Amino acid sequence: YRQALVMSAVVCGIAAYHYFRIFDSFNAAFVTEAQGGRGMYEQAAGHSFNEGYRYVDWLLTVPLLLAELIVVLALARKLQTSLLVRLIPASALMIALGYPGEISSDTFTRNVWGLLSTIPFLYILYVLFVELTKSLDRQPPAVRKTVSNMRLLLFASWGVYPIAYLIPIYFGD
C-alpha cells in the first residue's frame, strides 16, 4: 500500500495548493459591502475568477486517484497496466474536454464540450464496471463487495459533476 499512500499524499498536496489558489482568486474577484459576511457578492472591478485552477487540479489529481484505486487492488501486473493505460488518458481527456465549455458563455459551445467530456467519463465507468468485474471473479466475496461499494461511491460522487456542469446552461448562473 506504500504506492497508494504516496499517491494519496501527492493528491492532497496538489489539491491543497490549488484550492488555496482558488480561494485567493475568489477573494480577488468578488466583493461584498455587507458586514459580518452577509450579503450579495459582486464581481470586483478589474478582476475575474480563475476557473483554470480547478481544472488543472482535476487534470492532475483525477488520473492519480484512478491510479491509486488500481494500485491498491493489487491486481496482476498485466491487468493493472491494462487498466491504467486506459483509465489515465481517459480521465485526462475528460477534464481537458470539459474546460472549454466551462469557460464559454455560449450555450451551444458549453453543450458540445460537455457532451464531448461525457464520452471519456462513460468510458471510465465502463472500464470500472465491466472490465474490472471480469477480474473480480477470482477474488474473495469481501473484496468484490468493497470494489462494488467503491464503484457506486465513485459513480455517485462523480455523477454530480455533469449535473453541476449543466445547471448554469439551463438555469443560469
Segments from the language model and where they lie:
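Hydrophobic alpha-helical transmembrane segments of multi-pass membrane proteins
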Residues: 4-24, 161-162, 166
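Hydrophobic alpha-helical transmembrane segments of polytopic
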Residues: 4-11, 57, 83, 87-90, ...
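Helix-loop junctions on the outward
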Residues: 16-53, 96, 102-105
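Internal transmembrane alpha-helix with an interfacial aromatic "cap," most often the third helix
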Residues: 55-87, 99-103
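Alpha-helical transmembrane segments in multipass membrane proteins, preferentially the mid-helix core
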Residues: 68, 97, 120-142, 148, ...
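Membrane-interface helix caps and helix-loop-helix hairpins in membrane proteins
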Residues: 76-77, 100-115, 122
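Membrane-helix boundary/juxtamembrane motif in polytopic membrane proteins
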Residues: 81-86, 111, 132-159
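Hydrophobic alpha-helical transmembrane segments in multi-pass integral membrane proteins
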Residues: 97-102, 155-171
